[in-house]
């Protein structure tokens, strides 16, 4: 199996409800290691840049407004098949369709405020990690 890195966001709704620790526990229980983490309050420019691929979609303005509404936690996770493993832990984008026991089923209220984001591919993960973290901020776990 391949050791990969993936990018994750705990969104403003889950941060506001103090779910950070519970969500981190889910990552670690699944064998994903947190190798970088920080709290950020995105500016409009940062949010628009991060979600630029959605700029022509009808939900873009609401997404940017939501993602700038409060602090978020951004983290880089490392582990075997990390991209897929993380997405499985998150559950379906729409919490109404998310499997029982997933982060979105347990912590999200709606498709718009769905608790967390996860990279959808290794290429996306690399781009998203670099958007928030310098190489020096990544701390591979050696123990």
Curated annotation (Swiss-Prot):
Record: residues binding ATP: 11, 59, 87, 93, 104, 114
GO biological process: CTP biosynthetic process; GTP biosynthetic process; UTP biosynthetic process
Main EC class the enzyme belongs to: transferase
Entry annotated with the keyword Repeat: no
EC number: 2.7.4.6
InterPro entries registered for this protein in UniProt: NDK-like_dom, NDK-like_dom_sf, Nucleoside_diP_kinase, Nucleoside_diP_kinase_AS
Subcellular location field: Cytoplasm
Keyword ATP-binding: yes
Protein family according to the UniProt entry: Belongs to the NDK family.
Protein name: Nucleoside diphosphate kinase
